Amino acid sequence: NYYRDQSDIPLEERRKTNYDHPDAMETELLIRQLMNLKAGKAVDCPVYDYTQHTRSDQVVRVEPKKVILLEGILVLADERLRDLLDIKVYVEADADERILRRIIRDVKERGRDMEGVVEQYLTTVKPMHYLYVEPTRCMADIVINSGKNPVAFTLVKNTIQKILDEAE
């Protein structure tokens, strides 16, 4: 995960981080590592500790492949990153679905309480979605509505297959 390392900041301050703003991301590192993967070089991807609100000491070794899948709500927000992508997919979900998924994930996997998740959603997640995420919809090659579009899935699959065929 490419959230910035915040180990030099007190935990109470880290808890206030707006993770839905592009400044929370270490985009330069992501771009560098994606370029290395595309050049056939392995990379050590950082691992983020959501309970401590900072990067952990662990890394995940990622080997280069013919197809590299990159996902994240802010992936299309940076032009330099968009320019490195062969196909750009925007997955659309309505606001109710987004908040329900977030509550379930953050309570189950990140040790958060529901009240805190709802407050964060209303104060940062929702406004940042409309400011930084939704405007990137028009930059996508394909828009998929929460997995309910088999034609879009077929287009993505066929595009990936074409990339694989050309790589051989």
Across the structure, where does each feature detected by a protein language model lie?
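Phosphate-binding/switch loop-helix module in NTP-utilizing enzymes
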Residues: 33-68, 76, 164-167
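Short, charged, surface-exposed secondary-structure boundary motifs
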Residues: 30, 98-101, 154-155
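Amphipathic alpha-helical transducer elements in NTP-driven molecular machines
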Residues: 23-31, 82, 92, 111, ...
